[in-house]
């Protein structure tokens, strides 16, 4: 992470809310109260930001995705730019209740929106009645506002980043119910315990929001680079294994078995057969029969 505490100071990250609006649970991150304003400890902000960046980098590097949420006026453009540069889903308009806790219904609505877009592109919408086309286009405008940033989201996000915990309290609560880790900027009027990775800082000033979001974007981009490198290495390893397997099969097929001649047993008459001294197939030897002697007649005694 290239952001230093001095950079955070120059961006005004240390300015909290008025002391009368502070949340007692933010006390561990408050350095002092001056002129009725809570001053945030930038040392703790820097440590928390570094920890959050490491978490998001590992999450994205392992194949996860991050949902960027910032619907307040100061954060809209920054969040949209950050999500677009990292190809991540985002929400910069009104948070639609149930986006995380009732995702299956939202997913069907997104599929319907994509169907309308396809009909408009292919010209099939022109085949419908003008009254029906007008109704569909009005619905598409509403869907565009609600789903434009999450149309290509494959499923529930692996993690979520929010700019203002209080302003995005519904989104934060849904993430907690869905078991999704949440990283966010937490001002002195917010409860940091609602986030898994709170970043204490000014969530109202544009400069403060931008410097923190830029650090988050850099971490996500590093995670994407790690993911691509791992996929490339895995692909190369698979190709190498496939080539080795193919070579092994070919070698086994073409190999000639070796014979140890010292262990071959020869028949006893092999020498006679080789030298031609054995029996001939052309003139087989026939065993001679012994002559049979004629029996003499018996002489009777007188």
Swiss-Prot record:
Keywords: Ribonucleoprotein, Ribosomal protein
Biased composition (Basic residues): 287-302
Gene3D superfamilies: Glucose-6-phosphate isomerase like protein, domain 1, Helix hairpin bin
Ranges where the record places region Disordered: 275-302
Keyword Glycoprotein: no
CDD domains cross-referenced by the UniProt entry: RPS2
GO cellular component term, pick one: cytosolic small ribosomal subunit
InterPro entries to which the protein is assigned, alphabetical: Ribosomal_uS2, Ribosomal_uS2_bac/mit/plastid, Ribosomal_uS2_CS, Ribosomal_uS2_flav_dom_sf
GO molecular-function terms, A-Z: structural constituent of ribosome
Keyword Ribosomal protein applies: yes
GO BP, sorted A to Z: translation
Assigned protein family: Belongs to the universal ribosomal protein uS2 family.
The protein, known as: Small ribosomal subunit protein uS2
Organism per entry: Opitutus terrae (strain DSM 11246 / JCM 15787 / PB90-1)
Gene from which the chain derives: rpsB
